[in-house]
């Protein structure tokens, strides 16, 4: 049975109460009741993002986010979308430097469906992953890069700024979208190895918030996720340390056919978790 503890908001604060649990396979589960509306939200957060990618395989975390919607052993094709939307829910996924997450918002009585769907693809997506899915989503992601970065005014500005702010070899040197060359180079076996390493219960946090019965919800989580094996092969991410001061101004001028001039600037702020960082957050 899962073990857990409760974190309670201070009396009179108006805050919510959350309980945290951990399954035997390492999956962390956070539950929070909010009965204002008959809706429940599920978010499955995997501790893998673009900072965990290796040189020559940038964009793999984001590509795999797309592959997660291509069908699993029991829910083929677009079945995940169709089942959630057919039940009156909504869904999506996002990828960042640090993490990848998947989420559904469902009518309360359809919560079990969302939990089963997330557990199904965590546990059985590998069996359905094939070359057709890989090529399909590779093209989708490459087209997304063209639409959002390569073929729009100022589209590559943030990508250039990131590469300038973080030196070669730093895990933040590239953005989650990845390069065209690396997207072309990614193989089906790369995707399978990525899944085996990172899409494991001991590398994830499942949160369920809304009009829920915590005891019943936890029972469903144990029922659907409890038998998925953990995986201990994940390598630690590359060192993300940087000196406190850059020591110089780093500048790049780009000349392109765009409607007007634009300036994008970034500043090195104090380390996260310090009083100075908190002050900077308030100031900015």
Regions found by a protein language model. Name each.
Residues 2-50, 74-110, 148-203, 227-273:
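Non-catalytic beta-strand/loop surface segments
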Residues 48-58:
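Short pre-active-site segment immediately N-terminal to the catalytic Zn-binding motif
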Residues 58-72:
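Active-site SXXK
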Residues 69-73, 125, 213-215, 225-231:
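Bacterial peptidoglycan biogenesis and beta-lactam-recognition machinery
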Residues 70-71, 105-137:
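M16/insulysin-pitrilysin zinc metalloprotease superfamily fold
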Residues 125-145, 213, 232-248:
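Acidic/histidine-enriched alpha-helical segments
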Residues 131, 138, 188, 192-224:
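Non-catalytic, conformational "gating/processing" segments within enzyme and secreted inhibitor domains
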Residues 275-284:
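Short, intrinsically disordered, charge-balanced linker/junction segments flanking boundaries
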